């Protein structure tokens, strides 16, 4: 097995630095105009009053919510239960257009779709829709751009443009459900198919947009017709390690799935790989992750992109297992993520032999481990902070 050590570096772009020479982190969004207020942005209990404030009878709020959350439409032509006169104005006021589709790319026999959306101010975000044998998953964005400045991440190159609103976050799901309902995601298995699994692994750091993130999630789990009626257990929030946000998430009354994008068990490497590690070290992030498990009873996922000769050494697998086992058994699961082979780049796939050795080491030390397969290579179907990796087609237990 190789003991060579490759150092993280940017390729084709220059990482922004602060006055001390460290990678620049952006937690506060730049001042920009706000997207139009949408029904999603209003608490269900307040919608009737808000609608009345627009000069519209309050009972119309439930009708509008039914169209949007159940029929996945904001097109006034579909709302035949509303008076024809004023219907268009009503829809525009309560359900303004938040996402404009720029591009749609398909692969995997139509079972994977990557969407590029333009927001009201021209900012661009992506989401990836994937059909599996037992579920339909949507990988969604929470910010336009990202302020975490990771050297491997295409999203972080331009920095943070702005936070997305709760309406913009949820609208990715509604728009995806509309595509599914229209037969746009391969062969349907039944008439009422919809997205039933959400992963916050698209553009942005979810916990850096905490309030809008939680507002969106509460709309997702709110029963129809006031929300999407999804299961909190089928919503995964992934973070690069914003410890205060992890602790806040643990105190929410929702059994969400939590994933920590770790990618290195030692601070020396992770400081360069994940710049926010300079604020919250590996041990702090793992301690917060364990606290999440203790408070919620929900097993934590550790995301670990295997990068050739950078973080795939057996000794790092041993160190990772040691750190995880220090908290006990049964609380965590590791997901090594294979990269695409990229000749000439430092960000390239580990060899099969090194991948096997890394996983065998973790499993021999009692750490449950699942290697992720890839999905969407042909369309660069990257999903999340690790923008060069691809969300799995199946979770296959390593043999």
Stretches found by the model and what they are:
Residues 2-136:
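Flexible, acidic/Gly-rich N-terminal and inter-domain linker regions that tether
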Residues 65, 376-377:
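Conserved beta-strand edge residues that scaffold enzyme active sites
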Residues 131-182:
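Canonical Radical SAM [4Fe-4S] cluster-binding loop centered on the CxxxCxxC motif
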Residues 181-188, 194-361, 365:
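Conserved AdoMet/S-adenosylmethionine-binding subsite of the radical SAM
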Residues 336, 371-373:
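A structural preference for short, hydrophobic beta-strand core positions in alpha/beta folds
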Residues 368:
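Residue-level detector of anion-binding/catalytic polar loops
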Residues 389-398:
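Conserved small/polar residues in nucleotide/adenosyl-binding loops
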């Amino acid at each position: 097995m190789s003991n060579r050590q490759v150092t993280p570096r940017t390729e084709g772009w220059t990482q922004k630095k602060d006055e001390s020479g460290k990678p620049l982190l952006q937690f506060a969004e730049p001042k920009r105009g706000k997207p139009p207020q949408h029904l999603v942005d209003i608490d269900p209990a307040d919608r009737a009053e808000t609608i009345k404030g627009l000069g519209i009878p309050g009972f119309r709020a439930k009708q509008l919510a039914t169209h949007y959350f159940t029929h996945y439409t904001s097109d006034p032509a579909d709302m035949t239960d509303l008076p024809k006169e004023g219907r268009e104005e009503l829809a525009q006021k309560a359900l303004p257009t938040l996402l404009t589709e720029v591009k749609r790319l398909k692969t995997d026999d139509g079972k994977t779709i990557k969407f590029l959306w333009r927001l009201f101010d021209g900012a661009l975000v992506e989401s990836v829709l994937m059909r599996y044998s037992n579920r339909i998953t949507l990988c969604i964005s929470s910010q336009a751009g990202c302020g975490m400045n990771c050297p491997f991440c295409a999203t972080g190159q331009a920095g943070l443009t702005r936070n997305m609103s709760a309406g913009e976050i949820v609208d990715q799901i509604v728009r995806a459900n509309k595509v599914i309902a229209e037969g746009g995601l391969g062969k349907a298995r039944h008439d009422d198919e919809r997205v039933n699994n959400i992963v916050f692994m698209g553009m942005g750091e979810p916990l850096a947009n905490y309030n809008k993130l939680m507002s969106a999630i509460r709309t997702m789990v709110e029963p129809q017709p006031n929300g999407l009626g999804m299961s909190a257990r089928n919503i995964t929030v992934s973070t690069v390690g914003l410890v205060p946000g992890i602790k806040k998430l643990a105190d929410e009354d929702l059994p969400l799935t939590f994933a920590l994008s770790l990618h290195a068990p030692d601070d020396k490497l992770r400081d360069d790989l994940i710049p926010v590690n300079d604020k919250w070290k590996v041990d702090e992030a793992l301690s917060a992750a364990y606290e999440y498990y203790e408070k919620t009873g929900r097993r934590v996922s550790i995301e670990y992109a295997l990068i050739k000769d950078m973080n795939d050494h057996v000794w790092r697998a041993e160190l990772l297992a040691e750190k995880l086992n220090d908290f006990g058994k049964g609380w965590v699961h590791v997901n090594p993520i294979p990269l695409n082979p990229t000749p000439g780049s430092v960000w390239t796939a580990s060899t099969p032999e090194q991948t096997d050795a890394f996983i065998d080491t973790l499993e021999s030390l009692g750490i449950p481990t699942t290697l992720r397969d890839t999905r969407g290579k042909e369309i660069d179907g990257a999903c999340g902070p690790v923008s060069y990796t691809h969300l799995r087609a199946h979770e296959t237990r390593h043999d």
